[in-house]
């Protein structure tokens, strides 16, 4: 299993699939507001959750987080008012160099 070290502890990485119709049409200001809200909720939840990156597509946002478990990610979504339709633990990461 893929894990990152936070505070001396190995934490798993997760991908969150968020259904958000029209996500690809959100303005930079909209995305900044969503990001600010997410950062505030993360600060309130404590150091065991870390947002790494997000990918915005036409109707979904895929977010990559490091956290101890799925529960804190669903709590983050609830507190922030964000959808969290699918939360999946990452088993491995590959890239072109994997095939070399």
Q: What residue ranges belong to the model's regions?
A:
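Short beta-strand-to-loop capping motifs
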Residues: 18-20, 64-68
């Amino acid at each position: 299993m893929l894990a990152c070290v936070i505070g001396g502890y190995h934490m798993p990485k997760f991908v969150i699939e968020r259904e958000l119709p029209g996500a690809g049409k959100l303005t930079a200001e909209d995305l900044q507001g969503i990001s600010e809200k997410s950062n505030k909720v993360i600060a309130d939840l404590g150091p065991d959750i870390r947002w790494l990156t997000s990918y915005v597509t036409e109707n979904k946002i895929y977010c990559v987080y490091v956290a101890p478990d799925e529960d804190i990610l669903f709590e983050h979504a609830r507190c922030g008012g964000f959808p969290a339709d699918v939360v999946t633990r990452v088993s491995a990461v590959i890239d072109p160099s994997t095939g070399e």
